[in-house]
């Protein structure tokens, strides 16, 4: 039978489950709302939806490469215990592989896609893991990159996946260089690949701050502008990847390293688990007991 959009909407509101899960449940129960709710509960989907409101600030990053396409993903869970769970770790790797193979435009689109191109949706697979593992799991973000045959990816995971970096180079196939730059980005935490990525508004805002700092220091107005330009160069050196001193040879900037290799930096993505997420503070004993109580 045909399932109305209104019925799907109502079931989503009552259970918090994903759209495709709700539609499938209604189809399997011939549109019976209460039976559909029970079916979602039996499958753990409604239970998973309730957990989705809990803060997930732990987790892992993972990378995947397939030919000329690569991705880095961040998937969050609630505790470090689950972050070290092999089942969760496999899920994160599978999600990275899904992103590479299906090339979604957004997390929302990825969740509605058949997992790795077949069967249940990725969102459904994640909900099943939530029900099995007993914690909220959130596919937070991803970055996709493409290269030519004359390019190379540098995929680097730091601290077992607490930081994940994907660097894309063109004009070289030097895998060691690409990986070294991934390691560099993990350590130096740049915000931009090159100066061109820094918006005019951001540069002007930084220039204004530096100008006010110089004036507050009592510097003569006629030398303030030179001071501002000098300090602005330090801003670029701190936040722009190609302007930074290379971590393995601080006498050499990344831009020089790339030039020597005849390579160009197409782009990079750096994900650190939980950055920007407000984490609920619990002591270690409380975290242990929370896990014990789930058993």
Curated annotation (Swiss-Prot):
InterPro entries: EF-Ts_dimer_sf (IPR036402), Transl_elong_EFTs/EF1B (IPR001816), Transl_elong_EFTs/EF1B_dimer (IPR014039), Transl_elong_Ts_CS (IPR018101), UBA-like_sf (IPR009060). The keyword Hydrolase does not apply. It comes from the Bacteria. It holds the Pfam family EF_TS. GO terms for cellular component: cytoplasm. Keywords: Cytoplasm, Elongation factor, Protein biosynthesis. GO terms for molecular function: translation elongation factor activity. Signal peptide: none annotated. The keyword Transmembrane does not apply. It is found in: Cytoplasm. Residues 79-82 are annotated as: Involved in Mg(2+) ion dislocation from EF-Tu. Its main location: cytoplasm. HAMAP family: EF_Ts. Associates with the EF-Tu.GDP complex and induces the exchange of GDP to GTP. It remains bound to the aminoacyl-tRNA.EF-Tu.GTP complex up to the GTP hydrolysis stage on the ribosome. NCBIfam families: tsf (TIGR00116). Belongs to the EF-Ts family. This is Elongation factor Ts. It comes from Brevibacillus brevis (strain 47 / JCM 6285 / NBRC 100599).
């Amino acid at each position: 039978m045909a399932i109305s959009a209104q019925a799907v909407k109502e079931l989503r509101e009552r259970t918090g489950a994903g759209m495709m899960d709700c539609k499938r449940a209604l189809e399997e129960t011939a549109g019976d709302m209460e039976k559909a709710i029970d079916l979602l509960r039996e499958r753990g989907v409604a239970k998973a939806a309730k957990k989705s409101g809990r803060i997930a600030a732990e987790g892992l990053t993972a990378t995947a490469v397939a030919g000329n396409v690569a991705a880095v993903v961040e998937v969050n869970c609630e505790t470090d215990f689950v972050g070290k769970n092999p089942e969760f770790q496999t899920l994160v790797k599978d999600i990275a592989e899904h992103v590479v193979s299906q090339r979604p435009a957004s997390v929302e689109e990825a969740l509605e896609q058949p997992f790795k191109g077949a069967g249940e949706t990725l969102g459904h697979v994640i909900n099943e893991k939530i029900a099995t593992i007993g914690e909220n799991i959130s596919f937070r973000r991803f970055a996709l990159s493409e290269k030519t045959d004359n390019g190379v990816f540098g995929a680097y995971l730091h601290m077992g996946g607490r930081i994940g970096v994907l660097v894309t180079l063109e004009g070289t196939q030097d895998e060691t260089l690409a990986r070294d730059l991934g390691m560099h980005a993990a350590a130096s935490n740049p915000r931009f690949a090159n100066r061109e990525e820094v918006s005019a508004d951001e540069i002007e805002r930084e220039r204004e701050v530096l100008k006010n700092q110089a004036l507050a220091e009592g510097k003569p107005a006629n030398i303030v502008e030179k001071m501002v330009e000098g300090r602005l160069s330090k801003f670029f050196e701190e936040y722009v990847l190609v302007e930074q001193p290379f971590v393995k040879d601080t006498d050499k900037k990344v831009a020089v390293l790339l030039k020597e290799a005849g390579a160009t930096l197409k782009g990079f993505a750096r994900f650190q688990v939980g950055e920007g997420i407000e984490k609920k503070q619990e002591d270690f004993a409380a975290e242990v007991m929370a896990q014990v109580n789930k058993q």
